[in-house]
Each structure stands twice: as C-alpha cells, then as structure tokens.
Amino acid sequence: AILDHFPVNNGHCLIITKRHFANFFEATEEEVKAIYKLMHEVKEMFDIQYEPAGYNIGINVGRYAGQTINHLHVHLIPRYIGDVDDPRGGVRNLKNSLVEYDG
C-alpha cells in the first residue's frame, strides 16, 4: 500500500498488486484475498493514526469508469466528519452528472 499522490483526504492510499494486470476481474482468488487482508491491516492502522469517521473503498475498471492507470489498484479513502457538505450518494449520484466522455 502507498499513499495516493493526489489524495482526496489525509490517509488516502492505494492497495496495489505485485503482479501486473489491468483490473479487478483479472485477479486470482488468492490475489483478491491478499488485497482484502491488506486493506483491513491498513484500515486498522489508519483507525489509530487518523481516527476517521468512515471509509470509501473504490475500484475503477476501464477508462469509462475512470481508470487512468492500467494496473489494478484499490483506493482506501478515510472520511471525516464535515469533509464534504453531504457525503450521501457516492456513485448513486453519478446518473445525475453523466456527460459525454471521449477521454
């Protein structure tokens, strides 16, 4: 895991696989288990270090889903009280802001 170079919040990190492959659906069962285990370990450290009120976990698969790096990585983003006006919605609000994307 590494800290994101363009963090959304303090502690925003990336869980990155050793083996190179493009996206989550190419991961083996063992790799998915390793990602899950590391995510929990990092979360436990962040609970102590940053004391967040919650977390967002994100995986973008494909260019039109926002994937900009062609290597699987999972965003683990600590969330804090008051970090946004209204944290509800997440991707559920995506349909309200869809625009044509030609990347």
Residue ranges and their predicted role:
Residues 1-103:
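HIT superfamily nucleotide-processing domains
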